Amino acid sequence: MLDKIIRIATRQSPLALWQAHYVQHLLQANHPGLQIELVPMVTRGDIILDTPLAKVGGKGLFVKELELALLDGRADIAVHSMKDVPIAFPEGLGLVTICEREDPRDAFVSSHYTHLDDLPAGSVVGTSSLRRQCQLRERRPDLIIRDLRGNVGTRLAKLDNGDYQAIILAVAGLKRLGLENRIRYAMSAEESLPAVGQGAVGIECRLDDGHTRQLLAPLNHRHTELRVCAERAMNIRLEGGCQVPIGSYAELEGDTLWLRALVGAPDGSQMIRGERRGPAAEAEQMGIELADELLSRGAREILAAVYLDNPAR
């Protein structure tokens, strides 16, 4: 069973390579002697850096090339940041494993200010996420929000060069890259509700590859799977891509799941929030019901306007 080399498709960014090596470590810890090769690739999202993500088109922006490698046999598994995983998969492929979640919160990063509330009016804050932008604008309409693209190192360099007074990044990415010291504080879910699946690593493979699926089975983290299942069910119902102003965050308290969600107008003028508590075993249904509630309260109109403005989604 261990004589076959498992090839991992991954993006080439430092964070993506960290995730691929993390999965490699977990696989080899569970299957000593297993041979693994990394297949680094460049995705469309890595190439187009001069356009806001929402304008480029969010669905599959960072995963399509990896999925093609799975389909044509160049790779056996693809490792993704769950917040980049589209709501639908090509025929024959599927998400089979979700690893234990890292801290899913957003991080406030600044060279001179310790908190979002400390920023003077007119300060420039960098983020390309419509989800982060709408929450920032709701809380601090006096700030200037500008797009910020590139890998983590590039974004930090732009901050250090003085292009921005602060930037918002994922806590998980900074921790994984050994840059936790750059975090001024982790923003609470009340202040900045995370993205669907944020902080979790997912593994995609060919659904008919029983051998590989058997190798991956021990890596699945059930608690994380339940939480992300609820978040993704909500997102699927909303027909949300990766680059839309949707936040969703599920927490497990014993056998009870607490799911919070929001849909916001990018300018922060309208925010629709909701939450559900229920049995963790009903995670998917909770996500669907919460999405339906948000849609009935105006989320449909907000998202329609976003998609009209960003037709490439």
From Swiss-Prot:
Query: Pfam families from the xrefs?
Result: Porphobil_deam (PF01379), Porphobil_deamC (PF03900)
Pathway assigned in UniProt: Porphyrin-containing compound metabolism; protoporphyrin-IX biosynthesis; coproporphyrinogen-III from 5-aminolevulinate: step 2/4
**Broadest EC class?**
transferase
Protein EC:
2.5.1.61
Its GO biological process annotations read: protoporphyrinogen IX biosynthetic process
Q: Which cofactor does it need?
A: dipyrromethane
Q: Which Gene3D superfamilies match?
A: Periplasmic binding protein-like II (3.40.190.10), Porphobilinogen deaminase, C-terminal domain (3.30.160.40)
Q: Which InterPro entries match?
A: HemC (IPR000860), Porphobilin_deaminase_cofac_BS (IPR022419), Porphobilin_deaminase_N (IPR022417), Porphobilinogen_deaminase_C (IPR022418), Porphobilinogen_deaminase_C_sf (IPR036803)
Q: Which cysteines are joined by disulfide bonds?
A: none
UniProt xrefs under CDD domains? PBP2_EcHMBS_like
* Record PTM S-(dipyrrolylmethanemethyl)cysteine, positions in chain: C242
Tell me the GO molecular function terms.
Answer: hydroxymethylbilane synthase activity
Key words of the record: Porphyrin biosynthesis, Transferase
The keyword Transferase is assigned to this record: yes
> Could you tell me what reaction this enzyme catalyses?
4 porphobilinogen + H2O = hydroxymethylbilane + 4 NH4(+)
Q: Which GO terms describe its cellular component?
A: cytoplasm
Q: How is the cofactor bound?
A: Binds 1 dipyrromethane group covalently.
Tell me, what does this protein do in biology?
Tetrapolymerization of the monopyrrole PBG into the hydroxymethylbilane pre-uroporphyrinogen in several discrete steps.
Q: Give additional notes from the record.
A: The porphobilinogen subunits are added to the dipyrromethane group.
NCBIfam families in alphabetical order: hemC
How does the annotation summarize its subunit structure? Answer: Monomer.
Concerning its family, UniProt says: Belongs to the HMBS family.
Name assigned to this protein: Porphobilinogen deaminase
Origin species: Yersinia pseudotuberculosis serotype O:3 (strain YPIII)
Q: What is the lineage of its organism?
A: Bacteria, Pseudomonadati, Pseudomonadota, Gammaproteobacteria, Enterobacterales
Q: Which gene encodes it?
A: hemC
